[in-house]
Structures are given as C-alpha cells and as structure tokens.
Amino acid sequence: MYAVIKTGGKQYKVAIGEKLKVEQIPADVDSQIVLEEVLMIADGEQVVVGAPLVSGATVKATVVSHGRGEKIRIFKMRRRKHYQKHQGHRQNYTEIRIDAISK
C-alpha cells in the first residue's frame, strides 16, 4: 500500500515504514503529525485518485529529526563591471517516518 501526499509545495510517494526528508514542519521531535493532503492511494489493484484530494484520507507520520541540508553556493557576476557577489544557502528540513495510511 502506498500514497501520494503533498507537503511543502512538493509531492511524495510514501509507503508505511518509509523515512523521508520534507520541507520544515513546525512540530516537536517524536511527535505525531497528520498529513491530510492525500492526492492518491493505491492498495494492490485498487487505486483511488482524488480530484484534487482524496476525501477523508490521511497519512500519519512521526517526526524523527530536524536538520539543515547541504550548502548551495551562489555566485553572481556582471561582466566588465567588476561586480561579484557570493552567497550560500542551507535549506531546513524535517525527517519523518510514515506510520499509517488510512482511506
């Protein structure tokens, strides 16, 4: 059984017991969260696709940890103008574990 969920502006295919990194969610570590934006649920041959969401479907997950991703280096430059700009960015994320998928 798997589901397609939407969180943080992105879509993820998830199954029970899976761990994944999503955009930062304001929740404490080891707390339960309920993801209600379920786009699709598949259980064997039975597939339910929402338009756009599956009504009444939820995915329960546990927050495993919070962290920051790898640093991305940004370099801007204007030719012949002696302009250079260096920047860096590290995106915050939340690692979650999928506990249950309900229809």
From Swiss-Prot:
Coiled-coil features, chain-numbered ranges: none
Molecular function terms from GO: rRNA binding; structural constituent of ribosome
InterPro entries under this entry? bL21-like, bL21-like_sf, Ribosomal_bL21, Ribosomal_bL21_CS
Keyword entries, A-Z: Ribonucleoprotein, Ribosomal protein, RNA-binding, rRNA-binding
Give each disulfide bond as a residue pair: none
Q: Does the keyword Metal-binding apply?
A: no
The alphabetized list of GO BP terms reads:
translation
Any Gene Ontology CC annotation:
ribonucleoprotein complex
Superkingdom of the source?
Answer: Bacteria
Q: Quaternary form?
A: Part of the 50S ribosomal subunit. Contacts protein L20.
Extract the NCBIfam families matched here.
L21
The UniProt family comment states: Belongs to the bacterial ribosomal protein bL21 family.
Protein's job = This protein binds to 23S rRNA in the presence of protein L20.
| Protein name stated in the entry | Large ribosomal subunit protein bL21
Species this chain originates from: Chromobacterium violaceum (strain ATCC 12472 / DSM 30191 / JCM 1249 / CCUG 213 / NBRC 12614 / NCIMB 9131 / NCTC 9757 / MK)
